[in-house]
């Protein structure tokens, strides 16, 4: 699906064909999206998590954003860290904060939080822990719930 009503160039893809398309947009001579500039995750609400990838072709000087939506209950997207090496830490950060599992990733583990941290802090339904190993987890500011 392509949103042509926007100045931004983005395409929505289903997760099941993402890896094949990723390899194609990276190697197709007319595209050559050889630079993954950013990857991020967003909790869209209503049981939808979204992973976004921003690409640039240095040869053709064009840009593209790929968006992939999954449900919270089946938050799995094929990893592209073997296509663009930089995706390694991008995908790990999104996994750590939102719990999207990047299948096929060679080292998918938490990168910002301790391995035994409970939950996914950037999900809208996240319930913060009262304590962590007996230490009180403070709120950033009183009244923020």
Summary of predicted features, one role per range:
Residues 1-145:
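Terminal low-complexity/charged segments
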